[in-house]
């Protein structure tokens, strides 16, 4: 799964290219208009007051620019960026060491913050609220707590599973930023910007085609661009035109919807093996041989956003769009419309 060309997760070779293509300011940053508007106002206000920016939570599918925005915030605030992740902070002492190493206006970015263990998370509460670190020393009757002052820093949390955050942690973030999939026009613009930086010649129709198949995700758009560039240099004349881009994407097995073999495997399983659904997510994960979390975090968000699957109280069902994608006809529409009606009442995850 790590080497899947359309995965929104980081794979080998992404880090170097993402660094060179990463925008350095909100003005350069394409997409996420509402998030940018919020950040622009709050950053300017914090700078005018000579204060640290309030703590920020980014949540949404992977690959949408959370780390890039964290880097921009650090640059705008004139501080350094320290990057870590929830699973990497195993003990309270690990987090204490990070916090005491920060300076005023520095930004601490914790990816997968929903995976912090509870003892580590509790260290964050006074750090976020009071810029203080409570340390317990001694044992038994001689136990006492010492409070250390911390620099005025900004914590930025990122998560793909905001529902897994505890309420006490979530409530301590002053700026909440939901991240949405990018539209085709934004992705095409990102492709053109990347081409300018990498000195790649591309025709407008080709940038649209690559953007259309990028699953609403800039990371995927840039990854596809690099592979289409390779194809163009070997099979074409070095300029990416529409014909070349389509041929390259077909070779990569990325179809017009941005689906690859695994997406199609999921949809075919629901349609062919479970009569269009509903099928429980655990059953579906077992059937196609993938981890439950991988289905929910990586594959499902885009299929839901595209309207190819629908969540209901009884499980996932394939939509009419999914059937049309495979030129198939639903055997019975009565059960589908009944489940579809129930889905409007669905208020949780199955």
Swiss-Prot record:
Catalytic activity: ATP + H2O = ADP + phosphate + H(+)
Entry keyword set: ATP-binding, Cytoplasm, DNA damage, DNA recombination, DNA repair, DNA-binding, Hydrolase, Nucleotide-binding
GO cellular component, one term: cytoplasm
InterPro entries noted in UniProt: AAA+_ATPase, AAA_lid_4, DNA_helicase_Holl-junc_RuvB, P-loop_NTPase, RuvB-like_N, RuvB_C, WH-like_DNA-bd_sf, WH_DNA-bd_sf
Recorded family membership: Belongs to the RuvB family.
Subunit structure: Homohexamer. Forms an RuvA(8)-RuvB(12)-Holliday junction (HJ) complex. HJ DNA is sandwiched between 2 RuvA tetramers; dsDNA enters through RuvA and exits via RuvB. An RuvB hexamer assembles on each DNA strand where it exits the tetramer. Each RuvB hexamer is contacted by two RuvA subunits (via domain III) on 2 adjacent RuvB subunits; this complex drives branch migration. In the full resolvosome a probable DNA-RuvA(4)-RuvB(12)-RuvC(2) complex forms which resolves the HJ.
Entry's Gene Ontology BP terms: DNA recombination; DNA repair
Compartments in which it is found: Cytoplasm
Species assigned in the record: Clostridium kluyveri (strain ATCC 8527 / DSM 555 / NBRC 12016 / NCIMB 10680 / K1)
Function comment: The RuvA-RuvB-RuvC complex processes Holliday junction (HJ) DNA during genetic recombination and DNA repair, while the RuvA-RuvB complex plays an important role in the rescue of blocked DNA replication forks via replication fork reversal (RFR). RuvA specifically binds to HJ cruciform DNA, conferring on it an open structure. The RuvB hexamer acts as an ATP-dependent pump, pulling dsDNA into and through the RuvAB complex. RuvB forms 2 homohexamers on either side of HJ DNA bound by 1 or 2 RuvA tetramers; 4 subunits per hexamer contact DNA at a time.
Binding residues annotated for Mg(2+), in chain numbering: 67
Molecular function via GO: ATP binding; ATP hydrolysis activity; four-way junction DNA binding; four-way junction helicase activity
Gene: ruvB
Region annotated Small ATPAse domain (RuvB-S), chain positions: 183-253
Gene3D superfamilies registered for this protein in UniProt: 1.10.8.60, P-loop containing nucleotide triphosphate hydrolases, Winged helix-like DNA-binding domain superfamily/Winged helix DNA-binding domain
Chain positions recorded as ATP binding sites: 21-22, 63, 66-68, 129-131, 172, 182, 219
Domain statement: Has 3 domains, the large (RuvB-L) and small ATPase (RuvB-S) domains and the C-terminal head (RuvB-H) domain. The head domain binds DNA, while the ATPase domains jointly bind ATP, ADP or are empty depending on the state of the subunit in the translocation cycle. During a single DNA translocation step the structure of each domain remains the same, but their relative positions change.
UniProt protein name: Holliday junction branch migration complex subunit RuvB
Annotated spans, Large ATPase domain (RuvB-L): 1-182
Binding site for DNA: 311, 316
Enzyme category, top tier: hydrolase
EC number: 3.6.4.-
Region (Head domain (RuvB-H)): 256-350
